[in-house]
Structure formats: structure tokens, C-alpha cells
């Protein structure tokens, strides 16, 4: 029974300890998250401040070398603060009253000029720099052909140039004439082609006529026999004496042939 009682007591104690340990674990995780958020916010604020603040170095990087030289020359001409002397010569009063000497007071003009120079608006300086950048450089105006000071090239053509141009034109004309002559040899004109075609056509006709005459001359008898008609041949033969004799002999030998007009020679 005594052992069972402590076990029962340990159960509620462990149940109470579990939520406490979970809370401690959450707190331990929350601390690094909070630190990370603080670091990120600090980095963002620094970046924003850098972007908002104007950078005079960037402006100075865009300034060209002639403009920088001009600015340095102007700065050299201006008297520096150390060169301005605030001491003035002692003023001697002509009227001495009771042996009291008048104490000289320095004029406030140099100090006022220095304060005015120090109190100038930086935007005015930026505008001056932009104006210097936009204005053309004096060095480019003085030297047209580079820093070496070379003389300007004379673009006017002289008589030698004219002669050279004439020679080149003549050479080009000669080349063109040679090319045209070569083309005329290689490619005949259309007139020559037409004459050649007509010549071949006439030659073919003449050869055909010669062939016809040659054939008719060598086969004139055959052609004559083919052209002759039967009646025309009978008319020519009936007038001869030999034909009458032959006809009589045939009729006597074969009287049946009188009925027909066919004769066998």
C-alpha cells in the first residue's frame, strides 16, 4: 500500500511538469527568433538611411577631368582660412583723452565670409557640379585633333588629286571597254542569231529541192508509166500501124477476146 501511494502521487506531478517543460522549450525557441528579427530590422534601417543620404562621391565620379581641373584652379584662387589674417594694424587715435589708449577691434568681415561659406547649402554645390558636367569641356575646344596638337587636314583637292582622279577614270573606262568586247565575243548579238536561223532554214529548203529533182530524174520512166492513164495510152497506140496488125492477129487467134477490152502483151 505504501508503494502504491507514491506511484499515485508521481502521476499528477509528472502531468504538472510536462506543460512547464513545453513552455520552457517554446521560450528557448522564441529568443533566437526575436534576436533575428531585431538584426534584420537594424540592417534594413541602415540600408534605408544609406539610400536616402546623398553621396557626394558619386557626383564627383561623374565629373570629367577638365572640370575637376577647373574646380581645383578656383579653389586655389580662393584664399584659405589660414591665410586670412584677423589681425589689423593698431589704430592710433589723434586725440588722446586722459592717456587712455583706444583698443582696436577686429573687423568681423572675414569671419562673416567664413560663416557664409560654411553655411552654404549643399544643394547649391550639387547644382554647380551638374552645370559643370553639362557644359562642354574647354580642353576639347582648344584641341581639335587630339592632345598632340596636330595640324588640321586640308580637305581641298589639289591639281595632283585631280590628275589622279582623271587617271583612275580613264583606267576604269579601259577596263569597261575590254569587258564589253569580251562579252560581245562570248555572247553574240540577237541579229547574228536571227541571220543564222534564216540561213539554216534556206539551206534545208534548197536541199529538199535537190533531193526531189534527183529522184524524179532517176525514176522518170516509172513516174511516166504511173501517171499515164489507160485511155491516153490507147489513143496513142491506135494511131500506129503496128498496133492494128497486132490487133488483127489477136482477134484471129482468139476471137473471144473481142468481147473484153483487156489485152495481154
UniProtKB/Swiss-Prot annotation:
* Location(s), subcellular: Membrane
Q: In which tissues is it expressed?
A: Widely expressed.
Which parts of the chain does the record assign to the membrane side Cytoplasmic?
Answer: 218-265
Extracellular compartment segments: 50-196
| Record key words, sorted | Glycoprotein, Membrane, Phosphoprotein, Signal, Transmembrane, Transmembrane helix
| Residues annotated with Phosphoserine modification | 229, 256
Membrane-crossing ranges are 197-217
Query: One Pfam family of this protein, by short name?
Result: KCT2
Where does the UniProt entry say this protein principally localizes?
Answer: membrane
In this chain, composition skew of type Low complexity spans 79-97
Q: Map out region (Disordered) in residue numbers.
A: 73-123, 135-168
Residue ranges, compositional bias (Acidic residues) = 114-123
Topology within the bilayer = Single-pass type I membrane protein
Q: What range does the record give for the signal peptide?
A: 1-49
Q: GO CC annotations?
A: membrane
Under the heading InterPro entries, the entry gives: KCT2
Q: Which residues are glycosylated?
A: 75
What name does UniProt use for this protein? Keratinocyte-associated transmembrane protein 2
Per the UniProt record, the source organism is: Homo sapiens
Q: Which gene encodes it?
A: KCT2
Amino acid at each position: 500500500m505504501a508503494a502504491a501511494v507514491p506511484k499515485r502521487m508521481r502521476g499528477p506531478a509528472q502531468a504538472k511538469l510536462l506543460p512547464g517543460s513545453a513552455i520552457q522549450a517554446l521560450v528557448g525557441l522564441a529568443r533566437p527568433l526575436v534576436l533575428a528579427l531585431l538584426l534584420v530590422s537594424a540592417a534594413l534601417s541602415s540600408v534605408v538611411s544609406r539610400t536616402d543620404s546623398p553621396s557626394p562621391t558619386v557626383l564627383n565620379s561623374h565629373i570629367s577631368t577638365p572640370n575637376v581641373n577647373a574646380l581645383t584652379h578656383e579653389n586655389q584662387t580662393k584664399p584659405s582660412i589660414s591665410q586670412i589674417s584677423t589681425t589689423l594694424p593698431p589704430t592710433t587715435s589723434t586725440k588722446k583723452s586722459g592717456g587712455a589708449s583706444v583698443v582696436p577691434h577686429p573687423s568681423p568681415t572675414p569671419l562673416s565670409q567664413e560663416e557664409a561659406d560654411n553655411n552654404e547649402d549643399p544643394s547649391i554645390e550639387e547644382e554647380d557640379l551638374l552645370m559643370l558636367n553639362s557644359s562642354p569641356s574647354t580642353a576639347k575646344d582648344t584641341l581639335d585633333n587630339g592632345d598632340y596638337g596636330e595640324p588640321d587636314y586640308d580637305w581641298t583637292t589639289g591639281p595632283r588629286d585631280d590628275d589622279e582622279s582623271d587617271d583612275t577614270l580613264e583606267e576604269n573606262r579601259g577596263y569597261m571597254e575590254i569587258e564589253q568586247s569580251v562579252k560581245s565575243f562570248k555572247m553574240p548579238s540577237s541579229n547574228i542569231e536571227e541571220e543564222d536561223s534564216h540561213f539554216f532554214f534556206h539551206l534545208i529548203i534548197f536541199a529538199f529541192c535537190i533531193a526531189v529533182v534527183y529522184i524524179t530524174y532517176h525514176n522518170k520512166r516509172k513516174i511516166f508509166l504511173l501517171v499515164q492513164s489507160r485511155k491516153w495510152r490507147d489513143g496513142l497506140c491506135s494511131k500506129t500501124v503496128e498496133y492494128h496488125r497486132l490487133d488483127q492477129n489477136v482477134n484471129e487467134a482468139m476471137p473471144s477476146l473481142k468481147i473484153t477490152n483487156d489485152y495481154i502483151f
